[in-house]
Amino acid sequence: VKYQAQIIKVAVKLISTTVTLVIFAIAAYTLSIVWRVSNAEQSIFGRSDLIPLALEQKQFDQPPTQESYGKNTYSHIVRGQPLQVYEQLLNSFQHVYGSALAASEIGELGADLLFKANEYFEAIFWRNSGTLNFYFDTKKDLANNAVGRKIGAEIKTGSLSGAAAEQHMIDKVFMALDGGLAYKNCSEYRVSQLPSLNDYGCPFLLNIQEMRRSDKSVVLK
């Protein structure tokens, strides 16, 4: 009995250590994705909303455009062309590019699970969770994640590597955003027509958001 107890104790310790290492590895990898997306954001748009990487970032100090749906913008040269940048555009880039990065490294399933976990985290902890705008933003994020995963899978199976692969990935991300394959703003009408959160493989995510509603007259659907 004493020998069995020692075996159980060692097994429990081994499992505990393994779980701790796995959690640490996932957290470290997630941070690496956030860091690299932030670097790309700063380099391309002159601003990073994930991790501020510059002492002076571009500010949304210019009038709204049709694509920004009433939100302020700023002007920046993006890929050689002047562009009015708005917050939702940055968020869309984060999800498409971040999902593409993850899918190219850990596969589509890993990227899918990682970014779905992010949606649950935001639904639980973000202040505006439970609002209609947050709900549509979640649908937009999930749709953009799917677009990014396809891009990443293509890069993973392609012949390019290193800087060339990264540049091709960014090119594909902008093709998706500019071509309408991805969604630039959660206020677009077509976002409201996207599948339900359950259809995206996120059970109970809608329930969490509904629990966070401060205005019970708002229907999230």
Predicted regions located by residue number:
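Intrinsically disordered, low-complexity, mixed-charge
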Residues: 3-221
